[in-house]
Every structure is written in C-alpha cells, then in structure tokens.
Amino acid sequence: MAALDGLPPLRDVIQRHGLDARKALGQNFLLDLNLTQKVARTAGGLEGMTVFEVGPGPGGLTRAILALGAKKVIAVERDARCLPALAEIADHYPGRLEVIEGDALKADFESLAPEGAVKIIANLPYNVGTQLLVNWLLPKAWPPFWQSLTLMFQKEVGERIVATEDDDHYGRLGVLCGWRTEARMAFDVPPQAFTPPPKVTSTVVHLTPRKNPIPCSVANLEKVTQAAFGQRRKMLRQSLKPLGGESLLVKAGIDPARRAETLSVEEFCLLANSL
C-alpha cells in the first residue's frame, strides 16, 4: 500500500518515531499493509462513511481505511508517542483524519458520531477489547449509532463472540452478541503478522446490529447470564437459585434440570423477562 498512498512503509515509520509496542497498553502493531486492507474491506463499502478507530498506533489500518475512500476517520489513541506518526497521515489526507488523544473506555463515541450511521473498525488493544465491545452492545436505544463493527481480537475471544448453545465457547458474551447482533468470524491473522508477535492467533470478527432484537431488559439479561454461567456445570435450578431458581424456570417454561450452555439466546431472554 505504500505505493498506493505515497506514505512510507510502516516499519520505517515505527523505527523513525521509536514506536516499540508496549505490553502495558495491549499493543501489537499490524505491519502487513495487505492485511490492513483486508481488515478494512471486511467492513464493506467505506465510500463517504465516517469510521471510528481505536488504538491506531502507527496508523497501518488508518491508512487502509482512508485509501478505501472513507470520508473521515476519527481515531482514539491513548499513546502520545503515536501522535506524530498519525499527524503525518492527517497531513497526507487533509481534513479526513481526526485524532483524539485519550482512553477509549472513557470516550463517548455516540456523541462524536455525525448524523447517519458510522462504522467502527479496529485492531483492538488486547487489554480493553472485550469491554469496548460490550459497551457498544449495551446502549438502551437500538439500533445503535454504528452500522457495523469490524474488530480484531485474540481468536479465543472471537470464538466466544460467535458461539451459540452447546458450544464450549458459549457464555455471557455469546448471549449478548447473539441477542443484539449477527456476528461472524471473517479470517484469522497469524502471530507473525504483528510486531511484537503475540503468543496467540488473532481473528477478525464482523458484527451487524439486529434491527429488532427480542425485547428484553439488558440489566435482567446480565443478571441471568452472570448467575447461569457463573456455575455453568450445575443445573439451572441450582445456579439460578439467587434469582428464584426452580420457580423462575417453571415460569419461563424451561426445564430446571438443564444447564446454561444448552439454552438459546431466546430462552435466556425468556428468563430475563420472567424476573
């Protein structure tokens, strides 16, 4: 992509700005510009879109998003060392890149969103990725301000996101994602694509909001899944005892002898609505 956007190779950018990835910030920089384009393309058409990015680092994915025609990228970066490298990209794409220095967990993304839906594309820092996803799934207003999420996680997290009942990876995250989105794993990214190479394979997950998820209280769904999966090997009559146990299950029409991993998203919503 260096030839396409006229900017130097990422390795040169990292060396020139002294950007060693820091474990404390959950950083692993994706250097392969062909892969960053593949990530950006997974989000679908970007022409005229506003895109939010978290943890752009030296800007490899940022460059891919801009090169594919995004109208504007709003990037939240906590590491001040990366700002000069991102400023060079902003100069190359005048008016199309806004960088906000700060903690993405504290950012109010919805207030930053322009009129019309946005897409969120990010190689998420490993230490905050799951919490950010949960934050984006929990707004009371639905459909949300975002049109799609295209996010990179450790593969184990990706498997939890797309898992359904009777899957070993199924848990609270799978229920939440299955309730409000349609999620798929797009492709894996090997450790050697990053600097420094992480110990595990990564995966890109693409999520789109369900227009009409089952009406259900977020707070009640959280209570039910926390209790059920907190003791996932026990029968539901035991794990849900603090919430009413057998009487709650009978009210929802669910066999009290079943276990959490056998319940569908719809059945968890039934339980939440029976509280």
UniProtKB/Swiss-Prot annotation:
Its EC number is 2.1.1.182. Disulfide bonds: none annotated. Keywords: Cytoplasm, Methyltransferase, RNA-binding, rRNA processing, S-adenosyl-L-methionine, Transferase. S-adenosyl-L-methionine binds at N28, L30, G55, E77, D103, N123. It is found in: Cytoplasm. GO terms for cellular component: cytosol. It holds the Pfam family RrnaAD. Its main location: cytoplasm. It is an enzyme of class 2 (transferase). It catalyses: adenosine(1518)/adenosine(1519) in 16S rRNA + 4 S-adenosyl-L-methionine = N(6)-dimethyladenosine(1518)/N(6)-dimethyladenosine(1519) in 16S rRNA + 4 S-adenosyl-L-homocysteine + 4 H(+). It comes from the Bacteria. GO terms for molecular function: 16S rRNA (adenine(1518)-N(6)/adenine(1519)-N(6))-dimethyltransferase activity; RNA binding. Specifically dimethylates two adjacent adenosines (A1518 and A1519) in the loop of a conserved hairpin near the 3'-end of 16S rRNA in the 30S particle. May play a critical role in biogenesis of 30S subunits. Belongs to the class I-like SAM-binding methyltransferase superfamily. rRNA adenine N(6)-methyltransferase family. RsmA subfamily. NCBIfam families: ksgA. This is Ribosomal RNA small subunit methyltransferase A. It comes from Rhizobium etli (strain CIAT 652).
